[in-house]
A protein has these predicted regions:
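Extracellular secretory-pathway ectodomains and N-terminal mature segments of eukaryotic proteins
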Residues: 2-295
């Protein structure tokens, strides 16, 4: 089971409550920076550019940036698939994401969407390539608790996360992606996958991923897995394998600590995707709101 977190703050905070709300999925974000009219030049350019993204992203290793038009009618777009996606899977994911994005944001000049399998699509009327954008973001965590010694767990987890973040940040201009796993005692392993849009610099990729790791730690320390998604980066770790390993993108790790406890219960089996499990009702969503004046 998973919980999705979003933070909303109100002024004059006197007391705090956490309020649970109904199940939701991961939805596209429509920016309020401007609209275009039906059959306008900008609208036609947007449709043409988005239509080209699934084919070009899948043929280009899972990442593409593109532009079309001139002046105020120019459209900028980016699409990226998770680093272990096949070309066929990438095409399908980007195509589905675009259709959902266009249905939800039919006339917005800027919109952004991701799926649970981390297919990212972003378009705008201005250049955003290479720019670090931390919001909008979403955090999702597994409600199961870590049953190992937390001090030992934290040491192993931090070493693993540092390794995959360094590996991904040092990637190329076509792929900034890394996976890794680490032994937790003799009976468990921790798995992690991180990725940035490769238009980011090494420093900006590192910053995006480390802020995502910090967000997970601040909200969900001690849980059995988690995901943080941002416009420029994806951070996920679990206590079960959930990606296709590849030697060229696997981070090198230090030897793990010696086991100090008997085998704990196995973690939950991997879901098909974060998004699909939300839609099936297997994820619980909660919005953390700071409410004033409650006695």
């Amino acid at each position: 089971m998973w919980v999705k977190l979003q933070a909303v703050s109100l002024s004059s905070i006197l007391s705090h409550l956490i309020i649970s709300i109904s199940l939701v999925g991961v939805a596209p974000r429509c920016y309020d920076t401007g609209n275009f009219t039906t059959n306008s030049t900008y609208g036609r350019n947007r449709d043409l550019l988005l239509d080209s993204l699934p084919r070009n992203a899948s043929a280009n290793g899972g990442f593409i940036t593109a532009t079309i038009g001139q002046g105020s009618d120019k459209v900028y777009a980016l699409a990226m698939c998770k680093g272990d996606s096949t070309p066929e899977k990438c095409f399908s994911l980007v195509n589905d994401t675009i259709h959902e994005l266009m249905d939800t944001c039919p006339n917005q000049k800027e919109a952004y969407s991701w799926t649970g399998d981390f297919s990212v699509v972003h378009y705008a009327d201005h250049s955003f390539f290479g720019t670090l954008e931390l919001e909008p973001s979403v955090a999702v965590y597994n409600t199961g608790n870590v049953t190992s010694n937390l001090t030992e767990f934290d040491t192993v987890w931090e070493s693993l996360i540092n390794s995959v973040v360094r590996k991904a940040s040092n990637g190329s201009s076509s792929l900034k992606y890394a996976t890794g796993e680490a032994e937790l005692g003799a009976f468990q392993r921790i798995y992690s996958l991180v990725q940035c849009t490769p238009d980011l610099s090494e420093q900006r990729c590192d910053s995006c991923l480390r802020q995502s790791a910090s967000r997970y730690e601040s909200c969900c320390h001690g849980k059995q897995g988690g995901v943080v998604q941002r416009p420029n980066c994806y951070f996920r770790w679990e206590m079960y394998p959930f990606y296709t390993a590849n030697a060229s993108t696997t981070a090198s790790l230090s030897p793990p600590p010696s086991p100090s406890s008997p085998p704990p219960p196995a973690a939950s089996p991997p879901p098909n995707s974060v998004d699909s499990e939300i839609r099936k009702g297997k994820y619980r969503s909660a919005r953390c709101m700071l409410i004033s004046g409650i006695k």
